[in-house]
UniProtKB/Swiss-Prot annotation:
<keyword id="KW-0132">Cell division</keyword>
<comment type="similarity">
    <text>Belongs to the nucleoid occlusion factor SlmA family.</text>
</comment>
<dbReference type="Pfam" id="PF22276">
    <property type="entry name" value="SlmA-like_C"/>
</dbReference>
<dbReference type="GO" id="GO:0005737">
    <property type="term" value="C:cytoplasm"/>
</dbReference>
<dbReference type="InterPro" id="IPR036271">
    <property type="entry name" value="Tet_transcr_reg_TetR-rel_C_sf"/>
</dbReference>
<protein>
    <recommendedName>
        <fullName>Nucleoid occlusion factor SlmA</fullName>
    </recommendedName>
</protein>
<dbReference type="GO" id="GO:0003700">
    <property type="term" value="F:DNA-binding transcription factor activity"/>
</dbReference>
<feature type="domain" description="HTH tetR-type">
    <location>
        <begin position="10"/>
        <end position="70"/>
    </location>
</feature>
<dbReference type="InterPro" id="IPR050109">
    <property type="entry name" value="HTH-type_TetR-like_transc_reg"/>
</dbReference>
<dbReference type="InterPro" id="IPR054580">
    <property type="entry name" value="SlmA-like_C"/>
</dbReference>
<comment type="function">
    <text>Required for nucleoid occlusion (NO) phenomenon, which prevents Z-ring formation and cell division over the nucleoid. Acts as a DNA-associated cell division inhibitor that binds simultaneously chromosomal DNA and FtsZ, and disrupts the assembly of FtsZ polymers. SlmA-DNA-binding sequences (SBS) are dispersed on non-Ter regions of the chromosome, preventing FtsZ polymerization at these regions.</text>
</comment>
<dbReference type="GO" id="GO:0000976">
    <property type="term" value="F:transcription cis-regulatory region binding"/>
</dbReference>
<keyword id="KW-0238">DNA-binding</keyword>
<dbReference type="InterPro" id="IPR023769">
    <property type="entry name" value="NO_SlmA"/>
</dbReference>
<dbReference type="GO" id="GO:0051301">
    <property type="term" value="P:cell division"/>
</dbReference>
<dbReference type="InterPro" id="IPR009057">
    <property type="entry name" value="Homeodomain-like_sf"/>
</dbReference>
<feature type="DNA-binding region" description="H-T-H motif">
    <location>
        <begin position="33"/>
        <end position="52"/>
    </location>
</feature>
Length: 198
């Protein structure tokens, strides 16, 4: 029985990995059908549906992975790092690095892969970005408590500016067909971004 569950879990992971790879390839800029996905995995469409009730559920699973990966790591940064500037830099670098290491998932983050899918999926991505923005805002607000002085500019504006930078770099990565990596020249870009944090 345990072997059957493991085999089923492995097949589910294989399906999700194939979907992510298809999103990374030129197929990712078009609608991905279950027929194409089944062919990529080497199974029938019926076999896909034994593991996932719908393609939407497959995307849900990928979004769950994105959420878990980013939020868990952001929480680790907040636990381990106390300096506000370092926290912000590490969170931004985390988001950009995650996108760079997972190009197919970056198409989901930017919404490109979800254009042909249910609106609910885009809503989940919107919620994820709202959670990240809220965490950035909290880090910015905590500066006053941690370091004795805050920012002259409203923390809501600063948090949205940081997130807009991340979203812009991820969109550029997707638009360039993954040519312009989000972390390229990060050490030169970060001082420009950090200068806005006044």
């Amino acid at each position: 029985m345990a072997e059957k569950q493991t085999a089923k879990r492995n097949r589910r992971e294989e399906i999700l990995q194939s979907l992510a790879l298809m999103l990374e390839s030129s197929d990712g800029s078009q609608r991905i059908t279950t027929a194409k996905l089944a062919a990529s995995v080497g199974v029938s469409e019926a076999a896909l549906y034994r593991h996932f009730p719908s393609k939407t559920r497959m995307f849900d699973s990928l979004i769950e992975f994105i959420e878990d990966s980013l939020i868990t790591r952001i929480n680790l940064i907040l636990k381990d790092e106390k300096d506000t500037s370092a926290r912000l830099r590490l969170i931004v670098l985390l988001i950009l690095g995650f996108g760079e290491r997972n190009p197919g998932l970056t198409r989901i983050l930017t919404g490109h892969a979800l254009m042909f899918e249910q609106d609910r999926l885009q809503g989940r991505i919107n919620q994820l970005f709202e959670r990240i923005e809220a965490q950035l805002r909290q880090v910015l607000r905590e500066k006053r408590m941690r370091e004795g002085e805050g920012y002259a500019t409203d923390e809501t504006l600063l948090a949205s500016q940081l997130l807009a930078f991340c979203e812009g770099m991820l969109s550029r990565f997707v638009r360039s067909e993954f040519k312009y990596r989000p972390t390229d020249d990060f050490d030169a870009r970060w001082p420009l971004v950090a200068a806005q944090l006044q």
